[in-house]
């Protein structure tokens, strides 16, 4: 099942960890968290995809909406622990032009 | 392998949520059998997800879709067949993230582009009776 397994805040970042297929449902869960946290003036997000090894373009498209929301607030979306095929997919789509990408969560937090 | 002896696997998939993963699970098994790399296997799975979702969404039909994998020594051929109303593949616009951001533009529409980027060849045959997508992945010699 696709789900968010943890949401926590460290320094200025909201870290969202997902599990399972990154499809429309999971994308909508992520954007809900972002919308909620933006209301609390949190504008910097790290999406940890360690437990999500597969994605579809509908879930990825929702991340474009996330980027749009955060651009309006001078916020950022960082991605970490991406499986190679997810990184390649996001690169083909051009998503990685608008996100910071990191191998690990620690690297994302240290940016 | 001659044409007569090429092994094949056939799936019949109902249009139900996340059923595209049935196809990717099968593709994983076939990729292992063919000793394809992890990279090749991932690319096939991603292309198959997109092809299956497109068949689900664009066929405008509730009829099952069929997926046929044909294995040969040097390549895997996959056909994704829907029984929908057909479409003009030449009419598909290439999406661009720069134009999708900030322009109230629909964010979706990446499937065909991804399939073409991830597979070695892609061909659509479409009529009023449905669409057949044929895509191949060549085995890299390492």
Where are the model-predicted features located?
Chain B
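Bergerat-fold GHKL ATPase/HATPase_c domain
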Residues: 1-46
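Flexible, glycine-/charge-rich segments associated with ATP-binding catalytic modules
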Residues: 1-12, 100, 116-142
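Conserved ATP-binding N-box helix of the HATPase_c
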Residues: 38-63
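A conserved short beta-strand within the histidine kinase catalytic ATPase domain
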Residues: 63-70
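Short beta-strand-loop-beta element adjacent to the nucleotide/active-site pocket used for signaling
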Residues: 71-78
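Short coil/turn motifs at secondary-structure junctions
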Residues: 74, 83-85, 140-142
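Glycine-rich/acidic phosphate-handling loop/turn and adjacent ATP-lid/helix
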Residues: 78-107
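Glycine-rich phosphate-binding loop
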Residues: 104-119
């Amino acid at each position: 099942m696709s789900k968010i397994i943890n949401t926590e805040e460290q320094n200025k970042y909201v870290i969202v960890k997902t599990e399972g297929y990154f499809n429309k449902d999971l994308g909508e869960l992520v954007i809900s968290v972002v919308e909620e946290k933006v209301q609390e003036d949190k504008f910097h997000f790290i999406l940890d995809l360690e437990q999500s090894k597969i994605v579809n373009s509908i879930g990825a498209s929702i991340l474009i909406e996330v980027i749009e929301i955060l651009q309006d607030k001078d916020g950022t979306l960082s991605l970490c622990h991406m499986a190679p095929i997810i990184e390649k997919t996001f690169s083909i789509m051009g998503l990685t032009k608008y996100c910071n990408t990191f191998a690990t969560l620690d690297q994302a937090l240290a940016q | 392998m001659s044409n007569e002896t090429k092994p094949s696997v056939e799936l019949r998939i109902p249009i139900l949520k996340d059923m595209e993963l049935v196809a990717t699970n099968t593709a994983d098994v076939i990729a292992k059998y063919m000793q394809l790399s992890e990279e090749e296997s991932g690319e096939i799975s991603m292309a198959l997800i997109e092809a299956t979702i497109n068949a689900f969404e664009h066929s405008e039909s509730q009829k099952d879709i069929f997926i046929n994998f044909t294995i040969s020594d040097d390549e895997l051929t996959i056909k994704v067949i829907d029984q929908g109303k057909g479409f003009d593949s030449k009419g598909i616009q290439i999406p661009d993230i720069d134009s999708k951001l900030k322009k109230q533009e629909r964010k979706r529409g990446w499937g065909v582009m991804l399939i073409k980027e991830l597979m070695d060849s892609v061909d659509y045959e479409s009529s009023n009776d449905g669409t057949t997508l044929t895509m191949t992945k060549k085995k890299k010699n390492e």
